[in-house]
Amino acid sequence: MKGSEKITVVACYDYSMAALCDGADMLLVGDSAGMVVLGYDSTTRVTMDEMCLFTGAVSRGRKDSMVVGDLPFMSYQACTADAIRNSGRLVRAGADAVKLEGGAAVADAVRGVTGAGIPVMGHIGLLPQTAALSGGYRVQGRTRESALRLAEDAKALEEAGAFAIVLEMVAEEAARMVTKSVGVPTIGIGSGAGCDGQVLVLHDMLGLYGRFRPKFAKVYADLSGEVAGAVAGFKAEVESSQFPRPENSFYMDAGEADGLDR
């Protein structure tokens, strides 16, 4: 995959949307579901049970796309055994691979999970699960030193067996350098055009998440207004008795309703 066609990844969380997004190379069941679907204020509250539920829904909706399930906060950090056990849960739910955040610090976990036969996607740069501990949501790799650290992390993940690495909110020059330094594909999100592929959250692509809109996200179809308009139209037609109409209703056989209105 690296060096050939660009890789497209869409983060989505349910059966219906997965069926519509099946043309993407990969469907990422991100722990961002906690924010855009469950309304949490961060991804750290997402549980394994919730991730298994979302992963199962997406896997049932796809036909061709690879499904990658996110390991949520504290499902893999304590020990390699946890990482293997919880990765197995996501695979049983329907994932083809799992994703976890961190560089060299999680290399042992990556090695353990891949050793158990489960493909792993790495994730470096901005790490949403621990962003509060590292100064918040800031662009990574803006200095030469930090860019080189990212490259070291990427190489550690590759050596541990990761088949791809997400680069989140990494300065474009640094992301391009990291991409060239490893033999596995990099998937950028807010990291410029030099990565081997790109991932976006479906709700950002469709303008459906109202709390904030990341600078790196492009709205390909702003559906929030259309959804609100559809609900308003439904409400108005119900209140004015315009809905349901005859074509939306069912009727008894001829003669069976005689006398029922007395």
From Swiss-Prot:
Cofactor: Mg(2+)
UniProt binding sites for Mg(2+): 31, 70, 101
Active-site residues annotated for this sequence: 168 (proton acceptor)
Cofactor note text: Binds 1 Mg(2+) ion per subunit.
Pathway: Cofactor biosynthesis; coenzyme A biosynthesis
One GO molecular-function entry: magnesium ion binding
Main location: cytoplasm
One BP term from GO: coenzyme A biosynthetic process
Positions of 3-methyl-2-oxobutanoate binding: 31-32, 70, 99
Assigned protein family: Belongs to the PanB family.
Subunit structure: Homodecamer; pentamer of dimers.
Full protein name: 3-methyl-2-oxobutanoate hydroxymethyltransferase
Originating species: Cenarchaeum symbiosum (strain A)
